[in-house]
Structure formats: C-alpha cells, structure tokens
Amino acid sequence: MSAESLLHNTFSTEQIEVLENEYAAHNYHPLPVCFSKAKGAKVWDPEGREYLDFLSAYSAVNQGHCHPKIIEALVEQAQRVTLSSRAFYNDKFGPFAKYITEYFGYEMVIPMNTGAEAVETACKLARLWGYKAKKIPTDEAIILSCVDNFHGRTMGIISMSTDPDARDNYGPYLPNVGPKISGADRVLRYNNIEDLKYYLDTFGPKVAAFLVEPIQGEAGVMVPDDGYLEEAYKLCKAHNVLFIADEVQTGVARTGKMLCIEHSNVKPDVVILGKAISGGVYPVSAVLSSREIMLNFEPGTHGSTYGGNPLGAAVSIAALEVVKEEKLTERAAVLGEKFRTALIECKSPIVQKVRGRGLLNAVVIDESKTNGRTAWDLCLIMRSRGVLAKPTHGNIIRFSPPLVITEEDLMKGIEVIKKSLNDLPTIDMTPYAEKPIH
C-alpha cells in the first residue's frame, strides 16, 4: 500500500485497530474507539458515530479540539517559518517568552516540547541552582518527590516513580531522586507534611528541590488536604529548597484556577507547564522561574532543537489567549462544581468517592459491588452510549472534558455516566466486550 493511499484512504475503526496492533509497539491499551474528526468537546469515529470526549487527551485540549483560533495560528505560521532551532533568533519566540512569563507572573522561561522534557529541565535547573547557589557538594544534590507521583516516563523521571508499570525492568535508577532517599527510614508520602519535614530535617543541606503535583492526576485525581501545599512551601523556604510545581496536567485553567497551585495561595519557585499551553495541536512545554534561578543556565548547558520554535510559539500564544477570552478558568470552576454535585447526589451504591477540582475529577468504583464488572467495563458501556473516559489505577475513572463543553453537553454526559453506573452490576457485557484483533 502506497504512502498516498495510507494517508488518504478511509479506514474503518476495526482496520485501524488491526494496523496499530500489527505495526505499533504495544505500550498502550486504548479504549476501542477511533478518532477520525474532532471539534470542541465532540469527536467522531470513521463510521460517523459521535462521542463526548471526557478525557481531553489527559487535559491537553482544554480549549477544545481544533479550536478555530488556534488552528488559524498554526496554519498561518506554518506557511511562513516553522523551525529555526535556537542557533538563530526567530520572530515568534521572543514575543512568546514575554507573553507567557507575564501571563503566569514569572520573569523567565525555558521552552521545551513535552511535559517529560520540561520536568527533566526543571530537575536539571534545580541541581544547577543547588550546586552554584546553595553550594551543595558536587554530585550530592537531592530532588524529592512523593509516592504515587507521575512526572513522565524518561529514565530520570522513572527513577522517582513508585508505579511498577512505569518503573519495573528499567533499572538501574538514578540516585538521590524521588520519594525514598538512601539512608531514610521512610518514604515521602503525598499529602503528609510530617514526611516532608522528616526529609528536610534529615537531608536539608543537600536537598535542591521538592517536586510536587498540586493534584496527583495519574494516581487517581488525589486532591491534597487544605494547608498541605502551603506548609510544604513554608518548609522548603525554611530549608532553602526550591518548590517546584508540576502543572503539566493541572495547569491552564483545568482546575478552576489558571494554575492549580493558586488554590493554595502559593507561588512556586519553578512551574512546569505543557499539554494545554498549546491547545492540543502542537507539542509545547515550558519551565518558568525567576531570573536569579533561571540564569544558572548558560549557553550550551541545556537545549532542544525544537524548543522555542516559531510554530509552537505562535500556537501557544493563541491557545493562551483563548483561555482568557473565553473565560475558561471560570467555566471550569462552575461546571466542575455541577459535575461533582450531580454524581454525589445520584448516590450510586457502587461509587465510593467523587473527588476533584474544576473539571479535573475522578469517580472511585467499588468493584466489590459490581458483580465482577470493572471500571474498564463501565468505560466500555459509556463508550457505547457516546461518552469517552478511561480508568486510571484500576478502579478509578478520570473525567476531564474540554473546558469549552456546553452545560447541556456536560449534563448529557452526566446522565450517561449515571445510567451506566446503575446498569453496570446487572448488564450483559457481551455486546460491549472488546473484539479480539487478528
């Protein structure tokens, strides 16, 4: 089959599944639905079936799929210049750097492409600062993170992970990073201020940074107790440790604040952004910090061929403008409250908990009451009824629709979720089961 026919033929969902299973590594287990077209909060498969997207590419399309303003910026810039590398200046990165730093209230930015790259960049920056400013002995800097974190999948980042799926069989791991440091008598648990106090009291002079998610998304939308992040920040300041907020999934209005950390009235020393800063049309990420911290980077000490490219810069400016112009922060706060209230009030016996902030929410399924059915089965039922979501960590389903979703569509989605919850323990799963791929 020629490249032209592969690109322009219309394949069925089943054909797409076969092609992907045959030619792509099996490092994902997708829900059996294929996106062929998308607009706003809706997607369509090759057969023309319409769905409400309640995942938003893990919060990358906060502004909705194929937002016209963002697509226009992409097309216009793609026709002018797409890549210069940082070997030269381009006429979009400088304006983007000014725009994003003023937008989030920081002094300097270093641009990257993916969330994981931005996390790695922030960790390198923290180590640089630790050696050059804090005077930590060479090769002894520590970066702390929490149990059940998710910051990405690079070798450096999985050294911090406690998730067996992300970590196992990839060793050996980097020392001095993560929730368990050699010589400690405990792990550093999320939402446990005593654990952080222990680590800073024990290792403080060698700790460069504490890296934390304001809400642990992949762990099941774990919202910390009120006061936890404030106290964590104060402890970091007392020990001269950088407080780094990973806002790749939680940032850009998703939780009803521009940055999720704003719920805690904390301004981190370093903020990591990705996903929705480019509206889901081009990979862009960024690390924001003060001039004093950022200037520890010198020419040649870090870089990225694509980081700061004019195409990504133009797209990101448009994407961030959309957030403010369409008041997506306020929409997320209002619609998120309606979502949680509706699911709590339905009083489903199989729902253990509903939690979240803004339009980043999770429903915990009590699989002891579902007659052997699982959260995955529930997602298959919802898919057949036009709502797309996916489990995280087994019995937890994350719901995070685009922030542009109308209230009418949100309520339609909620009704599908409620009916599917009601039907799960007794429904015949045969029509919903995944077909084997040959």
UniProtKB/Swiss-Prot annotation:
<dbReference type="GO" id="GO:0004587">
    <property type="term" value="F:ornithine aminotransferase activity"/>
</dbReference>
<dbReference type="InterPro" id="IPR005814">
    <property type="entry name" value="Aminotrans_3"/>
</dbReference>
<feature type="modified residue" description="N6-(pyridoxal phosphate)lysine">
    <location>
        <position position="275"/>
    </location>
</feature>
<dbReference type="InterPro" id="IPR015424">
    <property type="entry name" value="PyrdxlP-dep_Trfase"/>
</dbReference>
<dbReference type="GO" id="GO:0030170">
    <property type="term" value="F:pyridoxal phosphate binding"/>
</dbReference>
<keyword id="KW-0663">Pyridoxal phosphate</keyword>
<dbReference type="GO" id="GO:0005634">
    <property type="term" value="C:nucleus"/>
</dbReference>
<dbReference type="InterPro" id="IPR010164">
    <property type="entry name" value="Orn_aminotrans"/>
</dbReference>
<dbReference type="GO" id="GO:0010121">
    <property type="term" value="P:arginine catabolic process to proline via ornithine"/>
</dbReference>
<comment type="pathway">
    <text>Amino-acid biosynthesis; L-proline biosynthesis; L-glutamate 5-semialdehyde from L-ornithine: step 1/1.</text>
</comment>
<keyword id="KW-0963">Cytoplasm</keyword>
<dbReference type="GO" id="GO:0055129">
    <property type="term" value="P:L-proline biosynthetic process"/>
</dbReference>
<dbReference type="GO" id="GO:0019544">
    <property type="term" value="P:arginine catabolic process to glutamate"/>
</dbReference>
<dbReference type="InterPro" id="IPR015422">
    <property type="entry name" value="PyrdxlP-dep_Trfase_small"/>
</dbReference>
<keyword id="KW-0032">Aminotransferase</keyword>
<dbReference type="Pfam" id="PF00202">
    <property type="entry name" value="Aminotran_3"/>
</dbReference>
<comment type="similarity">
    <text>Belongs to the class-III pyridoxal-phosphate-dependent aminotransferase family.</text>
</comment>
<dbReference type="GO" id="GO:0005829">
    <property type="term" value="C:cytosol"/>
</dbReference>
<dbReference type="GO" id="GO:0042802">
    <property type="term" value="F:identical protein binding"/>
</dbReference>
<protein>
    <recommendedName>
        <fullName>Ornithine aminotransferase car2</fullName>
        <ecNumber>2.6.1.13</ecNumber>
    </recommendedName>
</protein>
<dbReference type="GO" id="GO:0005737">
    <property type="term" value="C:cytoplasm"/>
</dbReference>
<dbReference type="InterPro" id="IPR015421">
    <property type="entry name" value="PyrdxlP-dep_Trfase_major"/>
</dbReference>
<keyword id="KW-0539">Nucleus</keyword>
<keyword id="KW-0808">Transferase</keyword>
<dbReference type="InterPro" id="IPR049704">
    <property type="entry name" value="Aminotrans_3_PPA_site"/>
</dbReference>
<dbReference type="InterPro" id="IPR050103">
    <property type="entry name" value="Class-III_PLP-dep_AT"/>
</dbReference>
